[in-house]
Regions:
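Conserved SGNH/GDSL esterase-like catalytic core that processes O-acyl groups on lipids
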Residues: 2-99
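Acidic side chains
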Residues: 15-16, 87, 106, 152, ...
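Alpha-helical structural signal in soluble globular domains
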Residues: 32-40, 66, 103, 107, ...
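Short, surface-exposed, polar/charged, turn-prone segments marking secondary-structure boundaries
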Residues: 38-41, 73-78, 106-110, 143-147, ...
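Hydrophobic anchor at the start of a short beta-strand
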Residues: 44-46, 115-116, 148
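Active-site loop/turn elements of alpha/beta-hydrolase fold enzymes
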Residues: 51, 85, 120, 153-155
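Active-site segments of SGNH/GDSL-like serine hydrolases
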Residues: 82-86, 104-137
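Catalytic His-Asp segment of secreted/periplasmic serine-dependent ester chemistry enzymes
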Residues: 122-206
């Protein structure tokens, strides 16, 4: 164990999905991640900052001011960008969506903040999913060009029966307990611990 390692602060930005929307247990995928990322040293603190219906342009404009209030010069600062499909309804072009994400990532890395990107999830509207897949691929390319971790939460779930059943039956089109669990599983198993550069065993750092 490296006794000189700084404590970790993780800020998560996104829309309602990061506030456990739709999950009857009230955990959401973020709460499940938190439960699997507990340690005494280094200490890991999470700060979820959901903004309803936020799009990539708004995230790019507001994230730094909000995140900076949670970061410290004495901590290892991390940023999770939970992307969504709101750019489509907002009429934001693919090139602008890519630029918005690029600006977030470049600003973060220039300030010593390490980003981790999660793609948009599928919609219960099959027609919209064609556009979401295209948008997600664009976001993935932006991350890949910077060699930054990107979790594809779209392709593994777009044809998942349990996930889609929850979306169809949900009042506001949000995933339920199973859906949030699936998103958390994808995040945890796509380089989450590698990104943190720590190993966890039964909630404790080893």
């Amino acid at each position: 164990m490296n006794e000189t390692r700084k404590n970790i602060r993780i800020v998560i930005i996104g829309d309602d999905l990061i506030s456990s929307g739709g999950d009857p247990k009230g955990l959401g995928w973020v709460g499940r991640i938190v439960a699997k990322t507990q340690s005494e040293f280094p200490r890991v603190d999470f700060y979820a900052l959901p903004t309803p219906e936020v799009n990539s342009a708004q995230l790019a404009d507001q994230w730094l001011d909000e995140a900076s209030k949670r970061f410290s010069a004495d901590t290892d600062n991390r940023l999770v960008i939970a992307l969504n499909a709101n750019d489509i309804n907002a009429g934001i072009s693919m090139s602008r969506s890519r630029l918005n994400l690029a600006n977030i990532l470049d600003t973060a890395t220039s300030k010593g903040v390490q980003p981790f990107i999660v793609s948009p999830i599928p919609s219960r509207n099959p027609q919209l999913n064609y556009e979401i897949e295209h948008l997600s691929s664009g976001f993935e390319d932006v991350a890949a060009r910077r060699s930054l971790p990107f979790v594809d939460a779209f392709r593994p779930l777009v044809d998942h029966k349990g996930f889609n059943d929850e979306l169809r039956n949900a009042t506001f089109g949000m995933p339920g307990q199973q859906g949030h669990g699936l998103i958390a599983w994808l995040v945890l198993n796509q380089n989450w611990y590698g990104w943190l550069a720590v190993k966890f065993l039964f909630g404790r750092l080893v």
